[in-house]
Amino acid sequence: MSDKDRIAQLLRELEEAKAREEEAKARAEEAKARAEEAKARAEEAKAREEEAKAREAQERCERERLQLEHRNTTFLEYLHNCHRHLYNALRLTNTSRYSTGYTKVVGKYYPKRLRPWTYFANVLHPHYFDLVQSICGQRQLFEPANTTKSLGTIISDHLAGNEKAIDRFEVDAVERPVQGILKVLATHKEAGKASICPEFRFSANLRELTQKDDGSSGADDNTSDGSLERRQQAGPNKRPTSKRKYICSNRQPDGVGIRMQPGGGQTHAFIYDYKAAHKVAIEYIRSATAKEHLFHEVVARINDDKLSRDEEVQRREQAEALIAMALTQVFDYMITYGVSYGYVAAGRCLLLLYVDRDDWQTLYCHPCLPADDVGEPTNDWTDRLSHTAVAQLISFCLSSFQSEALEGQSLETALSIAKATLKTWSESYADVAYLGLEPAELSSAPSSQNTDISEYTSKAEPTGRNVALRSQSSCKPAAVLPQSNEHDDEEDHSEPGASRLRLAANKRKRGPSSGGEDGDIAMADSGPTKQYCTQACLLGLKRGKDLDEKCPNVSLHRFDGSSRHPVNAHRFTDMVEQQLLLSPYKGCRMVDFWGKRGAMGWLFKLELLPYGYTFVGKGTLEDRLSRLEHEGRVYAQLDHLQGDVVPVYLGLVRLDRGYILPGLEFVVHMMLMSWAGQTPSASMDDAETLKRESLTAIWNEGVVHGDENRANYLWNAERGRIMIIDFDRAHLSPPPKPRAVSRLSKPKRKRGDSEADAQLFGPLEINRSKHRIRT
């Protein structure tokens, strides 16, 4: 091969190598492109995967949020929601448009001293908060967050300016949550066993109880004054109306805390009142309530009619006056309603109050300012939830449950002591030594309550009640904090008359003794304890018949072995009135001020002490006599149904002295009757049928009941039927003609019975042919 051919071959080989190199390079670039494409696809897939994960996480969070908002909440979660969504939802109007007029407190009791309630802040509240938290734990017992938020939206939509608006706010944001939490506690066996939390409710319908009679009943409009005058002139005990120790006044707080008693009755644990937010300036609350002589200063300024020229001082003095008057109003309620606990609710604050029954002149106050104490919202409020309004009011309620409200004889005794030791606005305490201390000095002054439990448990209250202390983290048996009766040596809290109150309380606690004068006194304190007499017994008394051997008290009725009643109907009524004249509490006890009451009166259990007759009375106020008299005419028209379809009517009596009620009202008139029975149980299938039978029976006698309240239809086991009560709204008409003869009717009465009824019912005309009384 020539050199030329060899060169050509080498060139071809070079070109082929170059081509192969370029081809390899192209393949490498193609592979690189494919790798980059694969990488891009992988990154895209990863991005889609991450997006899917993010979307799934977001959806999971939303589901969890919705589940969280719709599921029930724990105790701490509920406190958080109530404060954040309800309490903070309050929006106040421009207060400059509203009057800052003073609360009307002239003539009302006010304390000499105002002191910090440090025992509540340092002992009671921490104890009860820990106790509730330990009982509830992490159980989801309370309403969901979305429910609380929805209510908060409604609250924030309405501006609050006056007391009515504050009323609605307090009910929604504070009272309803507190009642819900206490309801859970009441069903818990540990709390129930320790009597820490009974069934409870807030009640704001007090004004219905003692409002003046409007005359809207079945009674004739012109019967009251005339018939009362006739009764006073014609009655066997004609005497002028005696004056009572106290003047009845319109002492009606905005609300009371009602608790159920073990026996089924109801009693009040505390009193509360609402105030418009602009009438209790929160910027002055702490400084004002730290002044021991706040009331003395305010009363002196008002009496002297002195105003400072400095605008800031004027604002402070006006704020102090409004706060002092708000406290005075509730203090007066606490005294006259016989309770040691009360509070003022003013939207942005609660003023929790306590009075020691051994020291009437000192009012203890714990200001609750949740907005300041809890602060701004954060991710973790756990350590500040005890400062919320709901948490503090729960502890206040639980504290109040350990004290008993005074009633009857003990209430009147306590009011006698209060009248002797307290001044009414705007009288001055003559012995007040105003020291002119600054608020800081006053707040740091020694107080007996720092080391003393006596201001928590009054000497006048029943002993033997303990407060169980339970550690949240301990499984050991609960420790017990006994209610001590000892007082701090630094100050004597005893006031004149306190020993008399303790004596009355001790007698009430011991119950009746056996026989003698002391036994009568105990009976006056404790009230009747015997079983009710039977319908047949009291009907026999009224008709002049033999004793009922089935009456549980027949041995007390029987004298000298006789089978006849020892007194007639007229003598019976006269003796009851004489017994109540000596003391309205002698053999007489209100059954249940809050539960056993009708539209116009309250139920009493009475015993005619010498003979053991035990029956009931329907007591009412001075201005409601006409309605009782009307009811007496109804019973007269239903005469031969008495003791069967309706109770046995035994006449009207007057309590000249009056049986004292919470709030300084007095039961003055009382209608005496046999005990009708109990409310039918829900399991009684034929209750409605029996009710219609009884209604038909009275309709056949010309009576339309006019009050369909369920409480007016009672099951009487002795008669095996439904009895009807409360005829103050009933309407009378002549019986239908021809009158249907009821299978339930009794035999016709003897002629002499009508004359006996004429003495019982007073100057009413007797129509003997119809055996009924008409006006």
From Swiss-Prot:
Q: Which InterPro entries match?
A: Kinase-like_dom_sf
Q: Which GO terms describe its molecular function?
A: DNA nuclease activity; kinase activity; toxin activity
Could you confirm whether the keyword ATP-binding appears in this record? no
Coiled-coil residues: 4-69
Bias category Polar residues: which stretches?
444-457
**Subcellular location per the Swiss-Prot or TrEMBL entry:** Cytoplasm; Nucleus
Query: Main location per UniProt?
Result: cytoplasm
Q: Example GO biological process term?
A: meiotic drive
> Where is the region Disordered?
18-51, 211-249, 442-525, 734-761
GO CC terms of this entry = cytoplasm; nucleus
Q: Which UniProt keywords apply?
A: Coiled coil, Cytoplasm, Nucleus, Toxin
Keyword presence, Cell membrane: no
Report, from the record, the phenotype seen after gene disruption. Answer: Sensitises spores to SPOK2 encoded poison.
The UniProt function text for this chain reads: Promotes unequal transmission of alleles from the parental zygote to progeny spores by acting as poison/antidote system, leading to poisoning of progeny that do not inherit the allele. May possess DNA nuclease activity that leads to spore killing, and a kinase activity that confers resistance to the nuclease activity.
Protein name in UniProt = Meiotic driver SPOK2
Q: What is the lineage of its organism?
A: Eukaryota, Fungi, Dikarya, Ascomycota, Pezizomycotina
Supply the gene name: SPOK2
